[in-house]
């Protein structure tokens, strides 16, 4: 039984109450009585509005379902369908031209294009690693991944392989030629880097002394001018540091003594309370809130054990250099942090209202994460030496919003939280995830509702695909999952997001972002493909690891995103008609083998993720697929897989017994993939009593009934069931 404290009309879990009063509030200038009185008022007045918005979602979905049932068996009349969506208020008029007015935004958002990490906040080690991933070793990223082939004697091996190391060095030199080319010759032939007055001079193997083709790209150094230990370059707004130490193991093999090239990598990071975590009660939430508080105070630390050794990981300080003019140059040593709150759907038992109902978790997150973030403001006396924002802003990503009314509710909520905390109006900035269909088709109207708060729009094609399937659940059978990325709507959706963001004046004020690279081990493929994101005009895109951030950073050196955006302005490429094209399968005559393959692939993915969510409380996992390729799975990928199978079940492509058979076939596969985990409990053969297996089955068989196809209601209930059974 949860111990609670009565505060006004609220019943607050004691673990949360104590955290807020004893840890989060001290140093903010807000006393406990003021905070809780304000929180009580916000929850009491806004929770009914939250419920009304969810009811509207259900009402619109019911009308869409009925329209498709009424038109079953006939090809969809695109014009009639669009008119219907307008008639019911799903598709709204585009607002008159406007530009956002967001102010006091850090340069990492306004003028620096680069990678963005997304990290589960419940894991302190991951959170620290991500915060410190502002800078990363290019040599390590290349050597330790498949970015460099292991062919021709270049295997990673257990010790240092000079053949592989030389390939890494050659790749890095080619990168330097692209990012900061020489006036003549190549960095590959460099034998010495020195500073002559205020100019970088490079000696080549043939004795030639040259300079940078664009001398202004040299911005700082460390060490003596005639023997620098670091050369700091700036290209497309991102820094790259050539580190020199001829006595080091790597530097001793390099003609110029270069031991590494360190890149500014994860410029921004989202600390996630949503899809990558499993937080179902007050205890879970407080773990995340405490980590978020520690990041903002600058005192989060974690004891790391590697074999017999252990060390304490903390946040990195700022990086100091000598500028070209001889003054001190200080660069931020940590990623600029956003926090992703949950959406509007779920409630959480951490606080009960006057009627004993769980309060909306999104309201809870807004109140508590904002309180913690006050400590990260450089204008606040609450922060430690390591502040987050230097412009006085708190950056909150708000996911899974459906249309402009819901964005308006978020901005109202943020305004109310500012009043509780005594913060200036518009301190709380919002990142709008464009991952629900009603937000996509009304994106300009959504942005307008946050015209003075928006700092970010981002396509989340995973969740967006889940909503695409669920919205048109009754329309017919959808294409197979692997075919979804080839459908007309998805390309239009990606272009529409950039086009709309630019038309609304986001350039120079906010990020226009793209989604996650999920194949964590396939970095060579990422290097080849993910450059498409900056080329599409996105000034940030998601990566799954610090290493991925460093490699993706090279793309922003090769592509001037702001120049790309300039070329795209005023040239809309996408239409709402294309976005409204439902990805129905043109034919459903799949063979039995094809159906089995689709079932097995999706069931294996679902089980692999759900078993760790339910049993271990892990919300983001590297889950091997049926071919043992590691994929980063979170609730968004689960939503697609479960909704696709629910759709096929609804339209008779597969039967309930087919689904159950596939789950029972795949459970031993997942068990085998987890056999190295001593804590893991097998699902097979006792399927009926295994909570995780039953949750996976429910997600598919009941998928058509789930609100917007979301997985949270079933996952939360089943996780609490597991925790109670194993208390």
Swiss-Prot record:
Tell me the residue numbers annotated for binding Mg(2+): 435, 463
What pathway is it annotated to? Carbohydrate metabolism; glyoxylate cycle; (S)-malate from isocitrate: step 2/2
Q: Which GO terms describe its cellular component?
A: cytosol
Protein residues bound to glyoxylate: 340, 435, 460-463
InterPro entries attached here?
Malate_synth_C_sf (IPR044856), Malate_synth_sf (IPR011076), Malate_synthase_TIM (IPR001465), Malate_synthG (IPR006253), MS_C (IPR048355), MS_N (IPR048356), MS_N_TIM-barrel_dom (IPR046363), MSG_insertion (IPR048357)
Compartments reported by the entry: Cytoplasm
Source organism's superkingdom?
Bacteria
Might you give the EC number(s) for this enzyme? Answer: 2.3.3.9
Residues annotated for acetyl-CoA binding in this entry: 118, 125-126, 276, 313, 544
Main role?
Involved in the glycolate utilization. Catalyzes the condensation and subsequent hydrolysis of acetyl-coenzyme A (acetyl-CoA) and glyoxylate to form malate and CoA.
Q: How does it assemble?
A: Monomer.
Q: What is this protein called?
A: Malate synthase G
């Amino acid at each position: 039984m949860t111990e609670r404290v009565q505060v006004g009309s609220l019943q607050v879990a004691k673990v949360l109450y104590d955290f807020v009063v004893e840890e989060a509030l001290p140093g903010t200038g807000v006393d406990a009585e003021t905070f809780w009185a304000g929180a009580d008022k916000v929850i009491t007045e806004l929770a009914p509005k939250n419920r009304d918005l969810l009811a509207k979602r259900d009402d619109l979905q019911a009308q869409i379902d009925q329209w498709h049932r009424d038109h079953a068996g006939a090809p969809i009349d695109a014009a009639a369908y669009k008119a219907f969506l307008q008639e019911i208020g799903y598709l709204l008029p585009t607002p008159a031209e406007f530009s956002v007015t967001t102010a006091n935004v850090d340069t990492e958002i306004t003028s620096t294009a680069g990678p963005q990490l997304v990290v589960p906040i419940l894991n302190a080690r991951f959170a620290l690693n991500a915060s410190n991933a502002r800078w990363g070793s290019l040599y390590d990223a290349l050597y330790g991944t498949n970015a460099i082939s292991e062919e021709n004697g270049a295997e990673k091996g257990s010790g240092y392989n000079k053949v592989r190391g030389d390939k890494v060095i050659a790749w890095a030199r080619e990168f330097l030629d692209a990012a900061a080319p020489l006036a003549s010759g190549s960095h590959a032939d460099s034998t010495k880097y020195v500073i002559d007055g205020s100019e970088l001079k490079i000696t080549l193997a043939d004795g030639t002394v040259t300079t940078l083709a664009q001398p202004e790209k040299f911005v700082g150094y460390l060490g003596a001018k005639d023997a620098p230990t670091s050369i700091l370059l700036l290209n497309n707004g991102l820094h790259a540091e050539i580190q020199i130490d001829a006595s080091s193991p790597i530097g001793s093999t390099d003609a110029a003594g270069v031991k590494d090239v360190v890149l500014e990598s994860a410029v921004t990071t989202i600390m996630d309370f949503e899809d990558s975590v499993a937080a179902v009660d007050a205890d879970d939430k407080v773990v995340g809130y405490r980590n978020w508080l520690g990041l903002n105070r600058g005192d989060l630390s974690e004891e790391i054990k590697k074999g017999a050794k252990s060390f304490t990981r903390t946040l990195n300080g700022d990086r100091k250099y000598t500028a070209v003019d001889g003054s001190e140059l200080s660069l931020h040593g940590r990623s600029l942090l956003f926090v992703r709150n949950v959406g509007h759907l779920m409630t959480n038992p951490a606080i009960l209202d006057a009627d004993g109902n769980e309060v909306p978790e999104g309201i809870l997150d807004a109140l508590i994460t904002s309180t913690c973030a006050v400590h990260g403001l450089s204008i606040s006396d609450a922060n430690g030496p390591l502040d987050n924002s230097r412009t006085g802003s708190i950056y909150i990503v708000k996911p899974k919003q459906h249309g402009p009314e819901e964005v308006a509710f978020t901005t109202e909520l943020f305004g109310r939280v500012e009043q509780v905390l005594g913060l200036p109006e518009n301190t709380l900035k919002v990142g709008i995830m464009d991952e629900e269909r009603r937000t996509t088709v009304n994106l300009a109207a959504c942005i307008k509702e946050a015209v003075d708060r928006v700092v970010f729009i981002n396509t989340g094609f995973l969740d967006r695909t889940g909503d695409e399937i669920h919205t048109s659940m009754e329309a017919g059978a959808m294409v197979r999952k692997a075919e979804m990325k080839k459908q007309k709507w998805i390309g239009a959706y990606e272009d529409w997001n950039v086009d709309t963001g630019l038309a609304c004046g986001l350039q120079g004020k906010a990020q226009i972002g793209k989604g996650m690279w999920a194949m964590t081990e396939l970095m060579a493929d990422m290097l080849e493909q993910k450059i498409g994101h900056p080329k599409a005009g996105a000034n940030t895109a998601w990566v799954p690891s610090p290493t991925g951030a460093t490699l993706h950073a090279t793309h922003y050196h090769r592509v001037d995103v702001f120049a790309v955006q300039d070329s795209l302005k005023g040239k809309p490429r996408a239409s709402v008609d294309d976005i409204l094209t439902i990805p129905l399968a043109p034919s459903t005559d799949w063979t039995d083998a094809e159906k089995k393959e689709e079932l097995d692939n999706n069931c294996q993915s679902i089980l692999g993720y759900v078993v760790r969510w339910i049993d271990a409380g892990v919300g983001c996992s590297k889950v091997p697929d049926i071919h043992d390729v590691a994929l980063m799975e979170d609730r968004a990928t689960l939503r697609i897989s479960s909704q696709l199978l629910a759709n096929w079940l609804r339209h008779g492509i597969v039967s309930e017994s087919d689904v159950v058979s596939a789950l029972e076939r795949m459970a031993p596969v997942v068990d085998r993939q987890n056999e190295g985990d001593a804590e893991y409990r097998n699902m097979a053969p006792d399927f009926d009593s295994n909570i995780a297996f039953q949750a996976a089955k429910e997600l598919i068989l009941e998928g058509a009934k789930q609100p917007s196809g979301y997985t949270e209601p079933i996952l939360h209930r089943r996780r609490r069931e597991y925790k109670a059974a194993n208390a």
